[in-house]
Amino acid sequence: MSIDESSLGLIGGRYRLDHYIDRGGMAEVWMAVDTFLDRKVAVKLLKPHLANDAQVAERFRREAIACAKLSHPNIVAVYDCIEFNGRQAVIMQYVQGKSLRNLLDKQKRLGPNLTVHIGTSVASALDEAHREGLIHRDVKPGNILITPEGKVLLADFGIAKALDSTDADLTNDNIMMGTAKYLSPEQVRGKPLDGRADLYGLGLVLYECLAGRVPFVGESDADTA
């Protein structure tokens, strides 16, 4: 991790980092406490080397603003977007539980009832996003969270894109984005996308839940895609 926990004060004057959770391709995630509302939140910090890239930082900020418009029980909520030490930070709902990826790694495959529950929950979340003009572009088990009570939430709209986006300088349809095993054919080819790409990815996830593997497997991620 790139932050010294012992040196931290309040981020944005109200969020106190508690402990490091995980990191992805663009950001690192921390659990924090909102000292104003006395509740746990997740803080997603853009990685330092990306924070120095003005285009990436601006895309990160714009996507946070777009995702903050989403209000749905199966979508991880975005509360705030701030800057900390020159890095963009998104304040999100903290979800206690584990990812579908963790569950599949442990159990290999799931029963039909749980699979249907996951599928309907994520489909409902995607319907809300698509109605608001956002496509997720990275529907995969690692971005599907399950609470101890069994609630399913779709997380990480980190590479989401507005369906009507014209920011050619900030995101390029000719660049393949997403996780190889769960990409739609149009994503593989770098073609323009709509909500059907997300539904294709969800279908691959549900196939894996039932079969214990994805339907298409190559020797490498590139071959799989």
Regions from the language model: what does each represent?
Residues 6, 52-55, 148-192, 219:
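Activation segment of protein kinases
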Residues 85-99, 103:
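Conserved short submotifs of the Hanks-type protein kinase catalytic core
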Residues 45-69:
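AlphaC helix of the eukaryotic protein kinase fold
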Residues 17-24, 29:
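Protein kinase glycine-rich loop
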Residues 122-134:
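Protein kinase catalytic-loop region centered on the HRD/HxD motif
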Residues 81:
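Activation-segment/catalytic-loop signature of the eukaryotic protein kinase fold
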Residues 118-119:
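Activation segment signature within eukaryotic-like protein kinase domains
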